[in-house]
């Protein structure tokens, strides 16, 4: 699919990492949101970094970005390739040793993060990059595409943790959310870190988690 030239927008992001399910979900709105997000990235000249699968929401968002002419980088553990890669793949697929290396590589090559609806794996990836932001390992924005209120319960939990003193109010600001791709990417573009960092210039960035900011 070709996006009309007049709709192209300038973005400060080169690549955005999208976390999402290897399932499509029961509602068509989840699938529509994945395609809409892919189209929104294309309209802003943003490339995609994702988990490398060709099934579920992963397959839909990657296909939309690829069809729009933007570059796609899929990062997938070797052990998951038989399960999550079916048929023809799109873009560049990089095989890594394990789930930990997958997350580190996805973060390294991205300027921002977006979570579509997903399950345990999506939540685990999302919470890790939020934690890295809280620790000062990166200051990249993290967004929830809250399709049909999918993440309302998670946001309520986080607000409860702030209320009970387990998450600081400034750390709560790490996460932004919106119901549509257009609104969410706009919020990510406008994001300015305001949380206090627990550590800066962590010497264990590469040694401990295998993550380093890409120039």
UniProtKB/Swiss-Prot annotation:
UniProt enzyme class: hydrolase
GO terms classed as biological process: cytokinin biosynthetic process
One Gene Ontology term of the molecular function aspect: cytokinin riboside 5'-monophosphate phosphoribohydrolase activity
InterPro entries: LOG, LOG_fam
Binding site for substrate: 84, 102-103, 119-125, 131
Nucleotide-binding found in the keyword field: no
Keywords: Cytokinin biosynthesis, Cytoplasm, Hydrolase, Nucleus
Disruption phenotype: No visible phenotype under normal growth conditions; due to the redundancy with other LOG proteins.
Subcellular location: Cytoplasm; Nucleus
Reaction(s) this enzyme catalyzes, per UniProt: N(6)-(dimethylallyl)adenosine 5'-phosphate + H2O = N(6)-dimethylallyladenine + D-ribose 5-phosphate; 9-ribosyl-trans-zeatin 5'-phosphate + H2O = trans-zeatin + D-ribose 5-phosphate
EC number: 3.2.2.n1
Tissue distribution of the protein: Expressed in roots and shoots. Detected in root procambium, lateral root primordia, vascular tissues of immature leaves, axillary buds, style and ovular funiculus.
Family as reported in the entry's similarity comment: Belongs to the LOG family.
Role this protein plays: Cytokinin-activating enzyme working in the direct activation pathway. Phosphoribohydrolase that converts inactive cytokinin nucleotides to the biologically active free-base forms.
Protein's name according to its UniProt entry: Cytokinin riboside 5'-monophosphate phosphoribohydrolase LOG3
Species annotation: Arabidopsis thaliana
